[in-house]
């Protein structure tokens, strides 16, 4: 949680079925992604999909680290 920006960061899992991408066409939006949520109402403020149409089980559920460098806020996965 970032109290200055009032955002909750959430990592999401890979789509299913994992290795058969033919059955789920497209990028499979919000899977294998970092999602920034408004904590008051759950609205998605932004997202970044690390692996669109993930067929390699590269989900994004590991811990995220929020830090500042050079005056910028950064999020490392």
Region locations from a protein language model:
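Active-site-proximal flexible loops/turns
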Residues: 5, 9, 45
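Short loop/turn segments immediately following the C-termini of beta-strands
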Residues: 13
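Short coil/turn segments that connect the beta-strands within blades of beta-propeller domains
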Residues: 4-6, 72-73
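Extracytoplasmic/lumenal domain signature
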Residues: 21-60, 67-72
